[in-house]
Amino acid sequence: MPLSNRSTLTQYLIEERRRFPGASGELNALILDVSLACKAIARAVAFGELGDALGDAAAMPTGGAVNVQGEVQKKLDVLSNEVFIRRNEWSGSLAGMASEEMETPYQIPGQYPRGKYLLVFDPLDGSSNIDVNVSVGSIFSILRAPQDVIDSGRDVTEADFLQPGAAQVAAGYALYGPTTMLMLTVGNGVAGFTLNPTLGEFMLTHANVTVPADTREFAINASNARFWEPPVKRYVDECLAGATGPRGKDFNMRWIASMVAEAHRILMRGGVFMYPRDTKDASKPGRLRLLYEANPIGMLMEQAGGRASTGRQPMLGVKPTSLHQRIGLVFGSKNEVERIERYHHEPVTREFATPLFAERSLFRD
């Protein structure tokens, strides 16, 4: 499509707003501020070592080394978090923010007006890959603040953010790869925008994104196989058995270790992603964070006709219990996710209680 015929992100949001004549435009303004933050991060990522942005945050003058998750921070983690805060705190759209990189909610400074939305984000997902030039991204979720927060203007608390994924009013991610893309839902399907570096604008390039219901691809970190629960072992075992196994078809396995990149591949061509609950660490019933990773990706998948789940229940129905709560996550092509859910609810047979890489392993020589 010629450039002149493509909508900008701003035009797209205006068209969406027209569906609701009483809308104030405050949500549109917030999404545009988020997109501006993503543009700034995309530029920093693109410069890499030339911009002195690679390496651990411990080398920065401001210090920083380990975040609230106990993870070593990269320079770009710290920079990206700061960009999100500075680009979004001033506009009057937000009552507060929460981030993977901050232990407690961020209060909007007193010199700025406060609004009716909450912004939750992972400023740089997959940052462990940044030093080896693998695609990374930013994930965000927008919630409506509780009415008493809006009415009183009080400081937000952790409890204000503990809303199920179904309460999200918008969600999306930016992918910093060969091109920078923004995938967005405002509750009316999923649209994809590509950053035009000449104009500095996100242009609509993927309208009405749909995840195929069936697939021949799955993504999982097979190094954790010994910790998987039996339903996950069963599913992977059957996929690996290929055309001669119970599924009657061959599957490909993918693993990038960057959830934004995995989610983008699935939105573009289908597939299923699994980072399930396992027995590796009993204190962590999952690896990914519910509020700013699982929920926004889950909303995108559901809006694109896919499915997101814990493996046992729909992801968007989970009631959060803490700001940085971890959870098992399965998302992608609807029929595959539903199969995995079904396996979790069926009785465990002795056959699939056997570790995948033990004597029955399909990897056995």
Swiss-Prot record:
- Top enzyme class, one word, equals hydrolase
- Binding note for cofactor: Binds 2 magnesium ions per subunit.
Q: Where in the cell is it found?
A: Cytoplasm
**Keywords of this entry:** Carbohydrate metabolism, Cytoplasm, Hydrolase, Magnesium, Metal-binding
Which superkingdom? Bacteria
Chemical reaction(s) catalysed: beta-D-fructose 1,6-bisphosphate + H2O = beta-D-fructose 6-phosphate + phosphate
> What cofactor does its activity depend on?
Mg(2+)
Annotated positions binding Mg(2+) 1: 100, 122, 124
EC number(s) for this protein? 3.1.3.11
The UniProt transmembrane annotation reads: none
Which residues does the record give as substrate binding sites? 125-128, 221
Query: SUPFAM superfamilies, per this entry?
Result: Carbohydrate phosphatase (SSF56655)
Query: Which GO terms are recorded in the biological process aspect for this UniProt protein?
Result: fructose 1,6-bisphosphate metabolic process; fructose 6-phosphate metabolic process; fructose metabolic process; gluconeogenesis; sucrose biosynthetic process
Point out the coiled-coil segments of this chain.
none
- What InterPro entries does the record tag this protein with? FBPase_C_dom, FBPase_class-1, FBPase_N, FBPtase, Fructose_bisphosphatase_AS
Q: In which pathway does it act?
A: Carbohydrate biosynthesis; gluconeogenesis
Subunit organization: Homotetramer.
Q: Which PANTHER family match?
A: FRUCTOSE-1,6-BISPHOSPHATASE-RELATED, SEDOHEPTULOSE-1,7-BISPHOSPHATASE, CHLOROPLASTIC
Q: What is this protein called?
A: Fructose-1,6-bisphosphatase class 1 2
Give the organism the record lists: Leptothrix cholodnii (strain ATCC 51168 / LMG 8142 / SP-6)
